[in-house]
Amino acid sequence: MKRLVSAFLAGAMALSLAACGGSASTSTAASSAAASAAPASSVAADNDLAHIQSNGKMVIGYTVYEPMNYTDADGNFTGFDTELATAVCEKLGVEPEFVEINWDTKETELAAKSIDCIWNGLTLTDDREENMACTKPYVKNAQVVVVKDGTDYTSTADLIGKTVVAEAGSAGETTITEDADLSQADFISKAVQTDCLMEVAAGTADAAILDLTLASAMIGEGTDYANLKMVDELNVEEYGVAFRKGSDVAEAVDNAFDELKADGTMQTLADKYGLTLAE
């Protein structure tokens, strides 16, 4: 009861002060707050680079994908894209924050602003470049056919009626649906590309269509998938980084790429991870 009375008296005093002229300072404070809040809202809506820099971080959407983004044997989160993104963020004066996403819903997460960009071996396509702000190409790639050792393979026609896997929403899936032979296979989508390797290794799939960059790093002698091999190279493609449509960050990242190419950083990383830079 004492608290209620005290609260009532405090409220009455506040109203009395407002009536005696306190409203001017309150109004000024509110106006100042609104004035200071308006630019922040405008920045977030119209200027992604300033928004990212004001937050002090770039939220990067990725999936586990060696050699681009993965955790090594010592428990360190690393990879070509991980190191490159960190170097670019340093040039932009922000910290990278890596957030694991579902690759099949990557565009939705980007549009919802739960991430600032998709930076994870993203294949550049006309559709993606039309609907998102993409950087220039920075790494070369291709889609390859992976099968178990001992498999007879001469062309994609050998996979008609067979079980073929690819990551949902990936360039591999597009390759399957658009290829005259592969489109006649029994296609099963998987959450990530590494799941595709597991299916082929286990014999539950006859072949996987996935990125050359990943296959080169993860299959063959000395790897966990020593019984798998690449037998065909299909679509040649290039990787880029995607931001929201109209974002000015893509251009800033392109400028950082130019600087990192000029000082040899990108080539050093490409050599480290066995990749080929885009021209």
Regions found by a protein language model. Give the residues of each.
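Extracytoplasmic small-molecule ligand-binding "clamshell" domains
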Residues: 42-121
